[in-house]
Each structure stands twice: as structure tokens, then as C-alpha cells.
Amino acid sequence: MDYIDFLKNKMAISHNTGFDINDDELTPTLYPHVKDTVRWAIKGGCRAIFSSFGMQKTVTQLEILRLIVKHEKGKCLVVCPRRVVVEFETQAKEHLQLPVQYVRTMQEVEACQADIMVTNYERVRDGELGVRIDPQYFTCTSLDE
């Protein structure tokens, strides 16, 4: 076996587990690099996006979740540091005219009218009075930072 074959045997291939979207489903005002990232992530399914500061990661996440809700129905959850929650709410409204709601308990989750909810890591890890937000309730869960 030569070195190139050795390297090829070491490569892990990430298979697509998502779905295709049409270009007209994307929010038209998104930057081209955001549209490309959204298409790639939606088609791939389980994907991580490691974009630099200022590359609209929050908007990218929200657009991915919006399209997942459109195609798969159900609810989506963003789990992020508490200091980032307001950014998600603001970016969703400003760039996508999308309602996003902060939730603290499973009771709030179950009563929430928004398709996309945001909470902080402590609510999932520790909960409130021992009751944690259960990510399995959601069609999709997205982790930020």
C-alpha cells in the first residue's frame, strides 16, 4: 500500500442525512456565503459550523432551524450561553422576521407558540427545581458556542 492509499483509508467520510432545499426557500436577503452554508448544513444533516466572528453564524443557525421546521415540522431549540440569548432574539427579528422565544422550563416549552426556542445551557444541564429542559422534545437542537 502506498502512502496515498494509506491516507485514503484513514479518511472519515461524513454521509448526508439531511434533505435538499430549493434556492427560493432561502431568505433572499442572506449573504451568498450564508446561503451556501445553510444548503450544506441542511443537506448534510448533523453538521458543525465553525465560522469566524462577523460571518453571521447566528443568522445561519436560525435560517437552518427555520427550514427544518418548514420541512420536518415540530419545534427547534437553540442552546447557548445566557449572554447570547438576546442576540438570537434580536437577529431573528431583524434579519428573518422570525419569532424566537426564550424558555426556562419544560412548562414554558410546552406552552410556547414559537417554533424556535432558545435557552441557556444551565436550563438543559441543571434545570429549575430539578426539572431540566429535555432536548428530545424537539425536532432539532442546535448548540451555540
Model-derived regions, located:
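SF2 helicase/translocase NTPase motor core
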Residues: M1-S51, M55-E145
